[in-house]
A protein has these predicted regions:
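Short S/T/G/P-rich N-terminal loop/turn motif that feeds into the first structured element of a domain
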Residues: 1-89
Length: 89
């Protein structure tokens, strides 16, 4: 299962981190397991999520046009587009 990393900005890093459990469920629903949250150490609002993607193409499709419940979760967590997606090769 290839590793996948998604980076993006957030409105507030601490608020984003407070939703860790909820985000893990939402990310798992898109096909990413063992998700790990990462926050930039430079004080910026840049974050990343890393995990194992069973079907990277399906995950990328889900993120390109997220279902309403995923979009609502992203908004509640303060996600700021664009999302950059990296896949282990």
């Amino acid at each position: 299962m290839p590793k996948m990393v998604v980076t993006h900005g957030v409105v507030d890093v601490e608020k984003w981190l407070s939703f860790k459990a909820e985000r893990a469920e939402a990310v798992a629903a898109t096909g990413v397991l063992n998700a790990v949250d990462l926050a930039a150490q430079d004080g910026s609002n840049a974050v990343a999520i890393m995990g194992d993607a069973d079907d990277p193409a399906a995950v990328m499709a889900a993120l390109a046009s997220p279902p309403p419940e995923v979009a609502a979760t992203m908004e509640r967590h303060g996600v700021v587009p664009p999302l950059m997606i990296y896949i282990e090769k």
